[in-house]
Amino acid sequence: MALLQIAEPGQSAAPHQHRLAVGIDLGTTNSLVAAVRSAQALTLPDEQGRHSLPSVVHYGETNVLVGYEAQDKSALDPQNTIVSVKRFMGRSLTDIQSGVHRLPYELHASENGLPVFTTPMGQVNPIQVSAEILKPLIARAETTLGGELAGVVITVPAYFDDAQRQGTKDAAELLGVKVLRLLNEPTAAAIAYGLDSKQEGVIAIYDLGGGTFDISVLRLNRGVFEVLATGGDSALGGDDFDHLLVSHLQQAWQITEPGSQLARQLLIEARRVKEALTDNDSVEASVVMADKTLTCTVDKSLFNELIGALVKKTIGCCRRTLRDAGVSVDDVIETVMVGGSTRVPLVREQVETFFKKTPLTSIDPDRVVAIGAAIQADILVGNKPESDLLLLDVIPLSLGVETMGGLVEKVVTRNTTIPVARAQEFTTFKDGQTAMAFHVVQGERELVEDCRSLARFTLHGIPPLAAGAAHIRVTFQVDADGLLSVTAMEKSTGVNTSIQVKPSFGLSDTEIATMLKDSMKYAKDDITRRMLAEQKVEAARVIESLNAALAKDAALLDEQEREELVVAIAQLDAVAQQDNIDAIEKAIANLDDKTQDFASRRMDNSIRAALKGQSVDNI
């Protein structure tokens, strides 16, 4: 799948077709689907106008219910109503064994150790359950958008490992849906606010949902999001606020043991009061019990007192996660609020106080992750205008490193499909060289000065060997997101260093086309300049090598011979300063001819030294 219609300069690409793609927030409690429509990313509602879908699946004797219908079955048939299946994704039964006794499901281990739920419709695994949640979201999207989807971007927690990510991808592929990308939830939130277009800085994503709290610290550098650290509490969320309020109401109304119906009524009323306190200083709570209406006024200060310890606990998680990330509060340039529970005024106040800046809240915190995923999906199917962020499934311009003389050695050539890995070996230029500087460049020209600089780094710890003896393996890896990792490793010691960069950052289609046209326009001139630079590098290498040899073995020559070599070296050095390829080549050949006898004597001398004290038998 090519994400950008690429044509050679002067040729037109195929007419652009709008492709349908969506972003899906596959949540623990609720899930959403979003799409870019008329250049605006929006979540898509169902026929009843509801945007979120409860992540709940009920297996009956003959049918499967998903969402609100399944949620209604949770009290009546908890054993066959699966909630929070995301917690089981990619985990073995052993991983979750400690919590099994508290779960109403009948769980068994499959042949590969993964958990399976026993239901009236047979055994199902977490991947199949997740696919049931995705199914109505996909159907909603195709109905709303009026066509088949070209692909989806699904969000996952930043801390998900490979098994959990693969399980999420498999759930979509069970439905025959192409997964364009799995996107970290905090990264999706940052994209929704357009933070990916900023140059650099640290971003905190504060995610307080119904059942969990997550804090993620990201570093943004030239369009690349790096997750520095994640933290949180998997058993702390807005539901805990509700339960504290329920306990208060029970105490106020002297209700000791409510039945299931009253307990549900209390919980619904607690949620209503919590939400109403977002915009009101006080709210009257009421429930009907035994034909009697109980009322109680709850003000904001009382509610804050009830939940204060829990909010403080989330701030403690933030403090620890910043410490794990190795950054301070002052390093954080933006704070993004995710999750419906971040609407609570006390939460926003505490977050603002801790991070010393007003958090970003203009996008609905329940929908922000899905919206970010939709923006990414729109880019990945090629619907983004060329002036916007560029994401490709091919390398648009060659990637390489600078070599001696300002030359470019291409490691990954343009139009190579990604993901890709390429490696090449380089060596040292001077005797005793213990470090090597690398300059990563992008472009089609032969000289570094005509290419785009991407990054620089240095490999230290190279063994001090003769020039050309050390072997440094340089590996270029470009992942599916277009992120380039360059690693340099000295083969004998294993010492290595690496750097990451996004080659597409700040690069438009127009700039790519211009660079390609220039490479063709100046091709002949570039080859000539490259040949000249190569001859100059070779001249410098020969001079360097011969000077080292004279310093070590000058005694092997008489005075006249030494003088002739010194003159020849000076002549080559002078010619190398000029821009005459043939003259430099002749001067190198002349010096090579004059050093033949010297080289033979050095070889004989080395052999004698090696054989000294050795018997014929040993040899």
Curated annotation (Swiss-Prot):
Task: Indicate yes or no for the key word Protease.
Answer: no
What Pfam families does its record include?
HSP70
InterPro entries linked to this entry: ATPase_NBD (IPR043129), Heat_shock_70_CS (IPR018181), HscA_NBD (IPR042039), HSP70_C_sf (IPR029048), HSP70_peptide-bd_sf (IPR029047), Hsp_70_fam (IPR013126), ISC_FeS_clus_asmbl_HscA (IPR010236)
UniProt keyword annotations, A-Z? ATP-binding, Chaperone, Nucleotide-binding
- Mind listing the GO molecular function terms for this protein? ATP binding; ATP hydrolysis activity; ATP-dependent protein folding chaperone; unfolded protein binding
Q: Keyword Nucleotide-binding, does the record have it?
A: yes
Q: Which GO terms describe its biological process?
A: iron-sulfur cluster assembly
Q: Which family does it belong to?
A: Belongs to the heat shock protein 70 family.
The UniProt function text for this chain reads: Chaperone involved in the maturation of iron-sulfur cluster-containing proteins. Has a low intrinsic ATPase activity which is markedly stimulated by HscB.
* Protein name, per record: Chaperone protein HscA homolog
Species of the source? Shewanella frigidimarina (strain NCIMB 400)
